[in-house]
């Protein structure tokens, strides 16, 4: 569901046949989509560089926030965690980076940095752009959403 936040959030599904858990998941997705839509559809689209070809990252950077969708499309070639640098942020501001798990948590392996398991961290824009965030070692075909807001 994380990658569908980047486009038109429609459902090719007979939602009248959904059970309570599925209906609740759709409601959480719709709420998150509505919240993030102004940034995703109105921000600049950037593609942070990642070394391992299994990673994909798409950042939407607006005037007041950023949304980053991070995914793996295959098994990681390198077991060592990679850093995600977030371009386009004001280097002089502090930002709160939150992992948005409303639509499900990504499955990951043996490396999960504290900021990821805790769900949020506050850092300067300069550090996010130059040093970046250590990524968890996601299993194949997993994704997560980061919401970046100034504090």
Model regions and ranges:
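Active-site-proximal substrate-binding groove within the catalytic cores of carbohydrate-active enzymes
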Residues: 1-106
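C-terminal beta-sandwich/jelly-roll accessory domains of carbohydrate-active enzymes
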Residues: 75-151
């Amino acid at each position: 569901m994380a990658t569908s936040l980047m486009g038109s959030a429609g459902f090719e599904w007979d939602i009248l046949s959904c059970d309570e858990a599925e209906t609740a998941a759709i409601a959480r997705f719709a709420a998150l989509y509505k919240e993030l839509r102004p940034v995703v559809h109105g921000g600049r689209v950037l593609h942070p560089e990642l070394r391992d070809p299994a990673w994909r990252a798409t950042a939407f950077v607006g005037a007041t926030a950023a949304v980053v969708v991070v995914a793996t499309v295959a098994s990681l070639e390198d077991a060592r965690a990679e850093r995600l640098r977030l371009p386009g942020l004001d280097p002089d501001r502090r930002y709160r980076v939150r992992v948005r798990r409303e639509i499900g948590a990504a499955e990951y392996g043996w490396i999960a940095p504290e900021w990821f398991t805790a769900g949020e961290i506050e850092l300067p824009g300069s550090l996010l752009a130059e040093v970046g965030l250590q990524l968890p070692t996601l299993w194949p075909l997993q994704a997560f959403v980061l919401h970046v807001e100034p504090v």
